[in-house]
Amino acid sequence: MLIIKLYIIILYINEQLFLSVFFFFKNIELQYMTFLGIQYVYKMNYSNIKSLDKYKTLTISVPKKWIYMVQLNRPEKLNALNDTMWREFKICFNQLATEPECRVIILSGAGKTFCAGIDLQDVMKFGQDLAKHEDIARKSKIVQLRIKEYQESFTAIEECPKPVIAAIHGACIGGGVDMISAADIRYCSLDAWFQIKEVAFGMAADVGTLQRFQKIIGSDSLVRELVYTARKFSAAEALQQGFVSRLLDNQESLLNSSLALAEEIANKSPVAVQGSKLSLIYSRDHSVQEGLDHIAMYNQSMLLSEDFVTAAVSQATKGDLPIFSNL
């Protein structure tokens, strides 16, 4: 048994030596990115951000290795959700879901506001187009298809196997709450505030808040109060009720803390992290036994991964952080 352990350690050391030499030559290009006056320097691997689609309402950046930042980029409209943004959300997160270099995603907003909710100008235009149809059944079908499109946009966040960290500052209203409810982790700054505003417009929220928000915070009574009244709730209340897990002083601290968390997650095995997310989502909507069966099925193959051996050797030798290949 001792010989086997020594053999594994030798293999591990040789592998790390090879990887160090490989990445020394592979990662020679330094990339500089500036966000809110903070300059991040990191070495690119073989990631090619140019391969991602170009978006009109979102900006994609890579502030650190394996970490992609998706930023809502309609600051002049308070990042309100127009038709283009709804479509681009789905395309973007489906694309990042299969991008091997992406291990963690940070979701943020440009300007003074995270998201002001749905763009009312788009709603008015949709209403005008709808008025051209006279038959109620055909109108209903058009509305149903539009709602489903909106739902799929944020479901893409939840179904993306990469953890999504929402970094919220300023206002987060209506569709913004739908959006971040689909994220894995939520951090916010002191100036953040939230509002499930749909009932104020004479409608029920239909893009995920009613389905996800109630499973995030612990009080069913409070969920109903916030939904039925459309009242604002502060960052402090969001923290108290468990809707966000950290409260930061300002936007700069918010982004720094989000990046630090993302980096910690990104250095873990992507097999383990993505498998954990899949199991958490599945288990949320299934019985305990069904959840156990699901993770057993997943791990019967994933425990045979090189990541398990790499992590085990690192823990046993208490050496450098293990290096995991992309998934």
What are the roles of these predicted feature ranges?
Residues 185, 225, 229-231, 237, ...:
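Well-ordered beta-strand positions
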Residues 187-192, 244-293, 304, 323-326:
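C-terminal long alpha-helix characteristic of the crotonase
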Residues 152-159, 167, 173-227, 241, ...:
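CoA-thioester-processing core
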Residues 1-60, 326-327:
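Eukaryotic N-terminal low-complexity, Ser/Thr- and Lys/Arg-rich leader segments
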Residues 35-110:
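Conserved CoA-thioester-binding segment of acyl-CoA-metabolizing enzymes
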Residues 77, 101, 109-153, 202:
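Glycine- (often His-adjacent) and acidic-residue-rich active-site loop
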